[in-house]
Amino acid sequence: MSSSSDPITAAVAGASGYAGGEVCRLLHAHPNISLRTVCASSSVGDPLSAHQPHLHGIGEYVLAPTDATTLSGHDVVFLALPHGHSAELAARLPEQTLVLDLAADHRLSSSESWERWYGGSHVAPWPYGLPELAGARAKLTGARRIAVPGCYPTAAIL
């Protein structure tokens, strides 16, 4: 991780989609974060502005391949990929990298629930990134892998 005086380096996988674009917008505006890499498998080589024309100041970024080689070397990686695509990629990222998964791949603790709602194989759950839940803050402390809650559960829980 960067020293306290250096900005935190960030990468966003799935930057061409809605959630990835919002993450890019928020990171670009953050004074202590340097957005270094944006990825989108189906749009490699496109400027970010081709998919996110509203993102002024970072539209010239070129979309890179969504793979572990491209994403490694950043302090934090945001995975804004379709459900079922984050788990394999996250498993190939260095353990010291903070990874936040916006998909459902690591949200559910029950294999039965995962298979019912999403299909496919279930992977191990990560701490749920909603510190307002009882006991969640302690699980998040020091975690290097975090499952970002979706909008519906967040609204229902809060």
Where are these regions (language model features)?
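N-terminal Rossmann-like NAD(P) cofactor-binding subdomain of oxidoreductases
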Residues: M1-L158
